């Protein structure tokens, strides 16, 4: 539901700072008007946040609080001096040709232009470290995005994104300029996509999305053909896993793919300690139980734990956020280059 009234609040260290005390003209106030059916669902109440070194690594980082990405987009950079919050800048994109309607369900922070300061990549647009618009591709909102040195043969960083609007599909772009390096087209909403270094036989990252079942290298070359993947998928018999004990209902479907012609496309993960990414995959509804996939160059194989069991068999683990199968926390807690 749309929040009709709520005094905006920001949090300092251990103390709440009310709007009007030090925020003043900071984050935009709630209202019943947002544009693009702002009160439909929660489109006017989409929030993102990040921490960025807007003045470089020699200075303290800033918090970047964001509202809106389907239409209007506001980004508020704020510093904390130990006593109060101070606005660094407020970016407002309220018309086309800007970051308006360009955001994603997450943002990416990184120095995309090589000036030593972080920029905010906001879906199909990028905001400079001073709060100005760096560029906008105009390709619109998307559900997934990845920023990094995806192509080691090119200078700087690249950005991979999928798009919700027909026919944009997915694309890899120069993170500094917005130049499209390669793209795939789709006939519908491309709701999933992933960039991960899963194949040591190809330089850089591999990318794939739900618009078509192909795995591409960082140059855009197809390394797994769509038709082959579909043939394998259509002829594959589903592998069924025995129902869980304890909280699991024996009538619930807990199947997962022991072997899949296409890698999962929700989350990458460092899992087994080698130099490649593994994949955090998920089984069927209603719990979408998590398990680990390993790409062997031809197909994705379910990777058991050291005791021979799958991840979801340990502690009856489930995921959240429906088909996105989001973990509550994924992080390297022990510093061993493996993520828990």
Role assignments for model-derived ranges:
Residues 1-340:
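Beta-propeller-forming repeat regions
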